[in-house]
Amino acid sequence: MMSKINQTDIDRLIELVGGRGNIATVSHCITRLRFVLNQPANARPKEIEQLPMVKGCFTNAGQFQVVIGTNVGDYYQALIASTGQAQVDKEQVKKAARHNMKWHEQLISHFAVIFFPLLPALISGGLILGFRNVIGDLPMSNGQTLAQMYPSLQTIYDFLWLIGEAIFFYLPVGICWSAVKKMGGTPILGIVLGVTLVSPQLMNAYLLGQQLPEVWDFGMFSIAKVGYQAQVIPALLAGLALGVIETRLKRIVPDYLYLVVVPVCSLILAVFLAHALIGPFGRMIGDGVAFAVRHLMTGSFAPIGAALFGFLYAPLVITGVHQTTLAIDLQMIQSMGGTPVWPLIALSNIAQGSAVIGIIISSRKHNEREISVPAAISAWLGVTEPAMYGINLKYRFPMLCAMIGSGLAGLLCGLNGVMANGIGVGGLPGILSIQPSYWQVFALAMAIAIIIPIVLTSFIYQRKYRLGTLDIV
């Protein structure tokens, strides 16, 4: 494979990204070279896209990314050999890329880093609860559930709650661990802090308002013994506070006193602040977010809110703001037992892939299918960046067609109050996360998200081709 690589193309790529001196670091993923450039403005993307091995390029998260294809590893090795760059891992690249980010991009990046390690558990929990609802909560034709009809399934239904409860009920433990780790603190202290937020000594958060909690009486003031089960924002703020406290203490406490002073003082202060100030404040924020989303997505404004979110979600992905929707989903699951947001995200994934299908059907451009076919499949499975950056944004109108299809599908979901058990896989498999009573409506919404973008994209492509106005950004 290395012999098939034209060294002239490699040298030209180096020149077009600004030369060897402009490359801070370079790594690669499955299909893309990921450059961190000292001066991003010196790169010439339009000329780079003319290179024979390049299928597209874009800037995201402070990285200049060049789409090569599945043989990107060979090009990476040739590039490393030509530039003399040392091979780096993804974390080193991300750290270097932050220098090219604006403050709000860095904030979103930090937010994503905290929640990303939790995704395997959260996705598993969403799918497990979905399967549990199918066997235990969905009435069959005789009015009974499968668990009622078959005792063995009732056992499975009860057993699966052990996993579902562990993931969502004790979610603050994972959030505190990840937040403290991100801040450079000791992860095990984050776990301990998280456990203190969901300890059996505390009144269950779901009973708040139904009964009076006990208190810790400190004389001049008291603190209610209330837990933060399944709460996102209190756990996030508490974890960040512990990380800040510990890292600051490390700087001023001598090494020989570290184990005696830093962990103990950090934990006591963080746990006290978590229950006295941070937790109640975070609960207020979380309740406010839940109130706003509930009225926008489930009240009389639901059709409008769902349609707008479905239409605008793809642009949120481009800006990176979509990372914040994870916390909203988790907050809704805690307060409502499900989320109306995740179904709209899954539909947006489908619509982006469908717009690419419209291009595949209409276009006969040389080598385009090498990126369009994998991009469409990827989007239908929940990862939309290859579809958006590789095809839809290049032509521009497929992006709008996908947004229209997603908005109309969202409108249908809003009209019918579609809810998901939790976050899960996106795209077509996203139906597995939907509460079973909404499967038929969601299947129809999926059909809208597939058909509308394909038809609109194909029609506009062919019309522009006939008029000679088809252009690529």
From Swiss-Prot:
Catalysed reactions, as listed in the record: alpha,alpha-trehalose(out) + N(pros)-phospho-L-histidyl-[protein] = alpha,alpha-trehalose 6-phosphate(in) + L-histidyl-[protein]
EC numbers for this chain = 2.7.1.201
- Stimuli inducing this protein: At low osmolarity, treB is induced by trehalose-6-phosphate, but it becomes uninducible at high osmolarity due to induction of trehalose-6-phosphate phosphatase OstB which is part of the biosynthetic pathway of trehalose synthesis at high osmolarity. Repressed by TreR.
Give the GO molecular function terms.
kinase activity; protein-N(PI)-phosphohistidine-sugar phosphotransferase activity; protein-phosphocysteine-trehalose phosphotransferase system transporter activity; trehalose transmembrane transporter activity
**Positions of transmembrane segments:** 111-131, 159-179, 188-208, 226-246, 259-279, 301-321, 341-361, 371-391, 399-419, 441-461
Q: Which Pfam families match?
A: PTS_EIIB, PTS_EIIC
Q: Describe the location of the PTS EIIC type-1 domain by residue ranges.
A: 109-473
Q: Where is the PTS EIIB type-1 domain?
A: 1-89
Q: Where in the cell is it found?
A: Cell inner membrane
Q: How does it sit in the membrane?
A: Multi-pass membrane protein
Can you supply a Gene Ontology BP term from the record? trehalose transport
User: Ranges in the Periplasmic compartment?
Assistant: 132-158, 209-225, 280-300, 362-370, 420-440
Q: Which UniProt keywords apply?
A: Cell inner membrane, Cell membrane, Kinase, Membrane, Phosphoprotein, Phosphotransferase system, Sugar transport, Transferase, Transmembrane, Transmembrane helix, Transport
Q: Report the main location listed first in the record.
A: membrane
Mark the residues carrying the PTM Phosphocysteine. Answer: 29
> Could you state one GO cellular component term attached to this entry?
plasma membrane
User: Which enzyme type, at the first EC level?
Assistant: transferase
Q: Which residues form the active site?
A: 29 (phosphocysteine intermediate)
Record-linked CDD domains = PTS_IIB_glc
Residues in the Cytoplasmic compartment per record: 1-110, 180-187, 247-258, 322-340, 392-398, 462-473
Signal peptide per UniProt: none
NCBIfam families named in the record? EIIB_glc, PRK11007.1, pts-Glc, PTS-IIBC-Tre
PANTHER family named in the record: PHOSPHOTRANSFERASE SYSTEM TRANSPORT PROTEIN, PTS SYSTEM ARBUTIN-, CELLOBIOSE-, AND SALICIN-SPECIFIC EIIBC COMPONENT-RELATED
Tell what the record comments on domains. Answer: The PTS EIIB type-1 domain is phosphorylated by phospho-EIIA-Glc (EIII-Glc) on a cysteinyl residue. Then, it transfers the phosphoryl group to the sugar substrate concomitantly with the sugar uptake processed by the PTS EIIC type-1 domain.
Anything else the record notes? Answer: E.coli does not possess a trehalose-specific phosphotransferase enzyme IIA component, however it seems that it use the glucose-specific phosphotransferase enzyme IIA component to delivers trehalose-6-phosphate into the cell.
**What is the protein name stated in its UniProt record?**
PTS system trehalose-specific EIIBC component
Q: Which organism is it from?
A: Escherichia coli (strain K12)
